[in-house]
Amino acid sequence: MADYLISGGTGYVPEDGLTAQQLFANADGLTYNDFLILPGFIDFIADEVDLTSALTRKITLKTPLISSPMDTVTEADMAIAMALMGGIGFIHHNCTPEFQANEVRKVKKFEQGFITDPVVLSPSHTVGDVLEAKIQHGFSGIPITATGTMGSKLVGIVTSRDIDFLAEKDHTTLLSEVMTPRIELVVAPAGVTLKEANEILQRSKKGKLPIVNDQDELVAIIARTDLKKNRDYPLASKDSHKQLLCGAAVGTREDDKYRLDLLTQAGADVIVLDSSQGNSVYQIAMVHYIKQKYPHLQVIGGNVVTAAQAKNLIDAGVDGLRVGMGCGSICITQEVMACGRPQGTAVYKVAEYARRFGVPVIADGGIQTVGHVVKALALGASTVMMGSLLAATTEAPGEYFFSDGVRLKKYRGMGSLDAMEKSSSSQKRYFSEGDKVKIAQGVSGSIQDKGSIQKFVPYLIAGIQHGCQDIGAQSLSVLRSMMYSGELKFEKRTMSAQIEGGVHGLHSYEKRLY
């Protein structure tokens, strides 16, 4: 028998890899490419991995994915799509307060459960009024009441089927002449549960189901389109009223209080205080103000990269923390300001401290691949915020353009001069609103068209699940528990190891991710 073989039982297993504590013990600044996670034992399928995770103290998401409040990433279309797939979007504030609040309102109106403030018309309104409402709101199924208001007697409903083939000369026709009358309507009584109402709607094969009280007065309505959305998007992030969750960004200055008021009126579920360096008297004062005026509104503070920064914001009362400084693909803060921290170290250090107080952490920036998402979650982050990864998708703001035959969309950092010139909100984020000379902390560029996130986000979700499967963690909470207990093991990578772990040795190749 060869002398290098040891005979006997197989019970002995040598220690292998580093715990997270050991990985970050030497004060090295590590980012996601600097380490790998060692595989564990698989006894479940990838689809069984539970990705439920906390966004804030009181808000939980079924998918740990968030879109960044950047003006080339998140407006209503992105926020709606992210919420439908179990995440959440944060509407940027590099715009007027009114525009931002209206974007939030679009998200909240997209799916509503019981609609208690629908568009209502009276029999004396015209077909033209219905067409105008369709242009403004995107639908034409409108209940008709005696006075044209909620709480009035229901007398009928007008749908697209009632007016589709009317000539333009008939647009002045009164709704009383074209509406489907009350006697032909299927309705549900006030007090019915949403589940019961949906069952009635499904059986009726109608597009809308009016809810009426004992006096036959309209008190609410539910839509068949919402029933379809429930079927097609089972992971959707919703509030207690069955509306999609929506976040919004605000600054930390006095005039941001007006913006905050409009956002809360529009229905924003959570506010992120948008600052490149969150450990400031301005942010602490704003947290105190919000918690005093809107005690039930969830507030995310940041950005921070150290436990000391996190402490001040946690003491002020934040419900979540956004971690990252200078690590985004369009960010030059570390280069220009000599301030920041490699993202892997930042996430681990802040998450390890914040968990003692029940404050979830968002890993914001530096995410280039689904593997980076898994690593961020394995270091203690509850959710991951994405900018460049979602830029240039169909849902991202902006128009496509062509350069050298490639379809592109603009993507810029909120610290770029381009963004600062558009609105003072970007200047305030970087404490530059009063400066004569603006110091750019970001760049402006373009990214190749990625298509819809309706395909991209499911790929990310599946990738996270498969990553957790290889690790041996059946949920994100188990993943974090394994990390903090020391069961999860890591290993540093040399530059040669990083090259080895990528595509190499080929003359040419095509990299298709999904």
Curated annotation (Swiss-Prot):
Location relative to the cell: Cytoplasm; Nucleus
Known cofactor(s): K(+)
Source species of the chain: Rattus norvegicus
PROSITE patterns listed in its UniProt record: CBS, IMP_DH_GMP_RED
Residue sites binding NAD(+) per the record: D274, S275, S276, G324, M325, G326
Chain positions with Omega-N-methylarginine modification: R341, R355
Main location: cytoplasm
Binding site for IMP: S329, D364, G365, G366, G387, S388, Y411, R412, G413, M414, G415, Q441
Active-site residues per Swiss-Prot or TrEMBL entry: C331 (thioimidate intermediate), R429 (proton acceptor)
Family as reported in the entry's similarity comment: Belongs to the IMPDH/GMPR family.
GO cellular component: cytoplasm; nucleus
Protein name: Inosine-5'-monophosphate dehydrogenase 1
Modified residues annotated as Phosphoserine in this record: S160
Record field: catalytic activity: IMP + NAD(+) + H2O = XMP + NADH + H(+)
InterPro entries according to UniProt: Aldolase_TIM, CBS_dom, IMP_DH, IMP_DH/GMP_Rdtase_CS, IMP_DH_GMPRt
Subunit structure: Homotetramer.
